[in-house]
């Protein structure tokens, strides 16, 4: 018997075409619409350009950067302490591309209307390709408001922070055109409670803003430890203060900044997170002594905003993969995406994704208008609301998207496992869920006008009885202050859903807004795929499914 004729056992059929090389912007109708709606129409060309990069070379680099994790090298071969973290070349490609396209700098260097929205849109695309590199990009972007509080230091650092040049060399910033910045706040004993920090700062000479100090202590989490400098917190005689700590001293020698080890994390694998010690590390005070938290808080707010954008991006990429798979997969002789139950699931996932995007880009518009009192109050509240709600929704949503793909969504050849492992970090980083909800209560009770700004934003329901009823119930919830901390999560969720519904209803696709309001403001669904009857789910699925050229 001649078995050679049977060497080819089967033909590969019923598999979706590859998405490799697709322009992530051009297949994303919601992003195209909302980025223009919120003021970034002038930037569509550069967003489109980044969409091609994100779906092509950056997507490929993302797989390599996560397969080849950063490695800590404490000493060189001669025994000298060097404290290096070595990255795969793909990581540097991700960083270089993002910095050259202005992801950490655009709103600061070109502060025209819509700049924050444009930058958030490109960050949204970048994070779909690879999210871990977003950490140093975000911290560099977010450091600018804090640096500006100390003009003498800003004069040295800001031109390099805002430069569109990436230089990963471990050398003093005087020899670099571009730098990145990190942040190190939490300690073993306190975590989020940074006022419990024990790291001490001792003046080298004169005391106060802009002066040099030596820091003695540790930080339990320091992400991107190969950054050129770090904003950090330490205690002085007047309390917790903010400092800029460079990797190198002015004479070019190593600063007393020692990496202890890299964290072995659930996800976020391309990004190095570390434990560090300061053993007399030279640093310069930023802002008023004893006012470290207020000084660094705007940086924290910006990083929380990027958590919203990042989680929205993870959900969008999961939806892209699931909807594309189901659009090209036959089950029982019928296209999976055209079968009623799968349409219910995919439409529900699409609602979650677009609602996350619209709230994130609405926040971007608020950041574009910092001198507008309403926008400033909106930003103060919704940074915490959105960070809580969007980041909280991502893990379950991505899990459901993977399930739509069956085993194909569970194997590491797919991007879904990486998205799923990545999703929890944004809920935890810069304050976990309870921290955000307590911040919502703080903003509403301590800062004048924030509650009024919320209800001014929500309006009267925009002609929709269901939204009007939700707003009325929300108002009643705030008149009852009993056990308000106990109810903080429910209140924050209700604010988020009300804002998402309002934004979708006010300017969005009517099929999407009707389905969102009908499923989120009414009913009590616990899992995806339980949308009520009577909705145009086919149109919602079509809106979210990549259209291949």
Feature-to-residue mapping (PLM):
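Conserved phosphate/anionic-ligand binding catalytic regions in large, soluble enzymes, centered on
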Residues: 130-145, 308-311, 315, 392, ...
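Flexible glycine/proline-rich, aromatic-decorated loop/lid segments
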Residues: 266-297, 404-435, 444, 451, ...
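A glycine-rich, basic-preceded beta-loop-alpha segment at the flavin cofactor/substrate interface
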Residues: 251, 260, 275-303, 320-337, ...
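C-terminal helix-coil-helix/basic helical segment that borders enzyme active sites and/or dimer interfaces
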Residues: 354-387, 402-403, 475-488, 492
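C-terminal amphipathic alpha-helical interaction region
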Residues: 447, 453, 457-549
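A short core secondary-structure module
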Residues: 210-256
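Extended, charge-enriched "interface" segments that sit outside catalytic cores
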Residues: 1-112, 548-549
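Internal helix-loop-helix
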Residues: 80-172, 223-224, 422, 429, ...
């Amino acid at each position: 018997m001649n078995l050679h004729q049977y060497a080819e056992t089967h033909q590969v059929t019923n598999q979706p075409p590859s998405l490799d090389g697709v322009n992530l912007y051009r297949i994303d109708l919601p992003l195209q619409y909302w980025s223009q709606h919120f003021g970034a129409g002038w930037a569509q060309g550069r967003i489109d350009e980044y969409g091609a990069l994100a779906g092509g070379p950056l997507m490929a680099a993302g797989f390599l950067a996560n397969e080849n994790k950063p490695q800590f090298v404490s000493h060189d071969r001669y025994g000298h302490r060097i404290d290096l973290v070595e990255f795969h070349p793909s990581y540097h490609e991700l960083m270089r591309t993002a910095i050259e396209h202005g992801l950490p700098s655009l709103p600061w260097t070109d502060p025209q209307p819509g700049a924050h929205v444009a930058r958030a849109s490109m960050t949204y695309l970048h994070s779909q390709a690879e999210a871990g590199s977003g950490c140093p990009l975000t911290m560099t972007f977010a450091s600018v408001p804090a640096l500006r509080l100390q003009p003498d230091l800003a004069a040295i650092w800001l031109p390099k922070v805002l430069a569109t040049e990436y230089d990963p060399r471990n050398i003093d910033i005087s020899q670099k055109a571009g730098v990145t910045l990190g942040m190190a706040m939490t300690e073993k004993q306190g975590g989020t409670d940074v006022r419990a920090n024990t790291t001490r700062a001792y003046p080298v000479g004169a005391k106060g803003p802009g002066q040099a100090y030596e820091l003695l202590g540790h930080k339990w989490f320091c992400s991107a430890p190969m950054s050129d400098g770090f904003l950090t917190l330490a205690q002085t005689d007047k309390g917790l203060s903010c400092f800029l700590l460079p990797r190198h001293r002015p004479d070019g020698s190593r600063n007393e900044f020692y990496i202890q080890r890299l964290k072995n994390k659930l996800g976020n694998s391309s990004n190095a997170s570390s434990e560090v010690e300061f053993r007399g590390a030279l640093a310069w005070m930023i802002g008023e002594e004893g006012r470290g938290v207020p000084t660094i808080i705007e940086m924290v707010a910006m990083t929380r905003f990027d958590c919203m954008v990042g989680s929205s991006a993870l959900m969008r990429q999961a939806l892209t993969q699931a909807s594309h798979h189901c659009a090209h997969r036959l089950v029982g002789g019928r296209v999976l995406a055209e079968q009623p139950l799968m349409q219910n699931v995919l439409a529900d996932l699409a609602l979650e994704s677009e609602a996350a995007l619209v709230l994130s880009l609405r926040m971007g518009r608020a950041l574009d208008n910092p001198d507008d009192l309403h926008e400033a109050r909106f930003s103060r509240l919704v940074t915490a609301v959105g960070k809580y709600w969007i980041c909280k929704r991502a893990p379950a949503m991505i899990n459901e998207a993977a399930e739509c793909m069956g085993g194909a969504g569970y194997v590491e050849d797919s991007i879904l496992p990486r998205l799923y492992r990545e999703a929890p970090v944004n809920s935890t980083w810069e304050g976990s869920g309870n921290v955000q909800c307590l911040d919502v209560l703080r903003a509403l009770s301590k800062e004048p006008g924030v509650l009024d700004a919320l209800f001014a934003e929500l309006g009267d329901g925009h002609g929709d009885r269901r939204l009007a009823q939700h707003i009325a119930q929300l108002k009643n919830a705030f008149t009852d202050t009993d056990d308000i901390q106990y109810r903080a999560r429910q209140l924050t969720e209700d604010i988020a859903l009300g804002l998402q519904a309002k934004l979708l209803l006010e300017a969005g696709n009517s099929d999407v807004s009707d389905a969102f309001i009908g499923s989120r403001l009414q009913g009590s669904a616990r899992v995806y795929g339980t949308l009520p009857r009577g909705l145009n789910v086919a149109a919602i699925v079509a809106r979210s499914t990549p259209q291949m050229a």
